[in-house]
Amino acid sequence: MKPLFLLSFAVLFTVGQAQDADPKQRARSVRDLAKQGEDAIPRLAPSLSDPDIGVRVEAVKALVEIGGPKTLDSLVRAAADNDPEIQIRATDGLVNVYLPGYVKTGLSGRLSRVGSTVTSKFTDTNDQAIDPFVQVRPEVIVALGKLARGGASLDARANAARALGVLRGRDAIPDLIEALRSKDDKLMYESLVAVQKIGDPSAAPRISFLLRDLDEKIQVEALETTGLLRNQEAAPQVRDALSHARTIKVRRAALAALGMIADPADHAIFIQNLSEKDDLIRAAAAEGLGRLKNPADRAVVSPMFTNERGMNPRLSAAFALVSLGELNTDRYGPLQYLLNGLNQRSWRGVASPFLIELAREEPIRQSIYAMLGMATKDEKIQLSIVLSRSGDRDSLPALETLSKDPDADVAAEGIRSLRTLRARLP
């Protein structure tokens, strides 16, 4: 009887604190509740409706600190608040449930508030995304979509757009497209990156109006997204952007986009740009030839692979040669050169996407399987990811072997990649 009495007293004491007339005391009570962990989640809910913004902010911070799936309902509710700081913190908290640690690098970690004015600072790093097998609750995507479309501030909207990209929120694409018409560079950029991460080709035609945007950063991102989504219909607009490029960055992005679209009509453009002085222009031209898959172009690309000194264009030439059918696995061949790139942190981000694209073809996967036995630790880890993204049923034995590798890091990635691949397969 005594323990029950003490519990009832504790609950009444907490409720009494929450009803305190002093907002500072109510905020203090919320912070104390957060220390109780998941059990405090239902008791924090009333504070999300507190008339004082400071108390509501503390309630959201407490939910984010507690974390875990049980906070989702309350965080979705908090995302509907009309205060930008609360919206930003709720957004980061929602993402953090699915990508633990996100809140440490999210926008809420760089917020400052003076009265009703909330200032924040976005980082340029935006390369995070959940694993494809992670299932996000629909109401989370709906809540973030509403924020991207009409949050309380442009920062809150941009932060929600970034979150949708991290969570691969396909159902919120209409909200992201609406955000692209905001005329705010930050929001437009984050929305483009999100569309790119989601990777739905049906969204591509709806971003074409940005291919001639006057802001270089927006135009470059629109060109990159158009290429990655393989929007064939936009090829004339991309060619126009290439011929009227105001900067080298726009020119690179336009040629790279044409290289990804891979229209045979652009063959002469690729040949012409193979001899350009700029490394990235030569690289994009080689990639375009690789994707056109004209066997005769091996004679053009092969000398480039042999003689090229720039790392970027040489990796691109290696990609092109493998795409054109050069599948030998010797130590000086193009496929091994791409694998070598996986060992270097500075070039892994170039070599890995090439291999992910190439591994969609079964003959190339067979060559990769043959090379796994002699692969380094980094190569095994990265090739696990490649096969998880582009493999088929024939990749299961290779990933099962990697999941049992003596190296713990290799085995861990093998298990994770095996799970990703199985989730992808019909």
Residue ranges, per PLM feature:
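N-terminal segments that cap or nucleate solenoid repeat domains
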Residues: 14-58, 62
